[in-house]
Amino acid sequence: MERYQMLHNAKYIPGQIVRHSRFDYRGVIIDVDPTFQGTEDWYNEVAQSRPPKDHPWYHVLVDEQDAVTYVAERHLDADADSSPITHPMLEAFLGARRDDGTYAPLHTMN
C-alpha cells in the first residue's frame, strides 16, 4: 500500500510528454519509481544537482534520439508541444497516442 500511495503522489504518469527543465529536451515517460532506485555511484557521478532521492524519479525516452534517461521529478515539466515523440523504442513501451496527446502504456513496468 505504501508504494501505491507514493506512486499516487507522482506528478507525471507513463505516456505523458515532458520537457527536461535543465537540459531542455522533450521526452515521454515510460516508467515511474516512487523514490530513487539507482546506485550511489550513478547518483554521485550523474546527478550533479543532487535532486532528492525520496521523491519520484522517471524513465524517459528522449525525443529524436535513441537515449533513455532517468530523471528526478523536480527537473521535469509538462510539455505544451503537441507534436508526437520520435524514438526507436517507443512502440516497445507505449501504444496509440490519445486525443489529449499522451500515449497509452502497453504495460506497467513497476
Each model region followed by its residue ranges:
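Mixed-charge, Lys/Arg-rich low-complexity intrinsically disordered regions
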Residues: 1-17, 22-26, 33-36, 106-110
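Intrinsically disordered, low-complexity segments enriched in polar/charged residues with Gly/Pro
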Residues: 3-7, 46-48, 80
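Intrinsically disordered, low-complexity boundary segments flanking structured domains
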Residues: 16, 44-49
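Short, glycine/acidic-enriched capping/hinge loops at junctions between secondary-structure elements
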Residues: 30-31, 40
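A short beta-strand motif that forms part of the nucleic acid-binding face
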Residues: 31-34, 64
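Short, solvent-exposed secondary-structure boundary/capping segments
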Residues: 36-45
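Intrinsically disordered, low-complexity, charged/polar segments
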Residues: 50-110
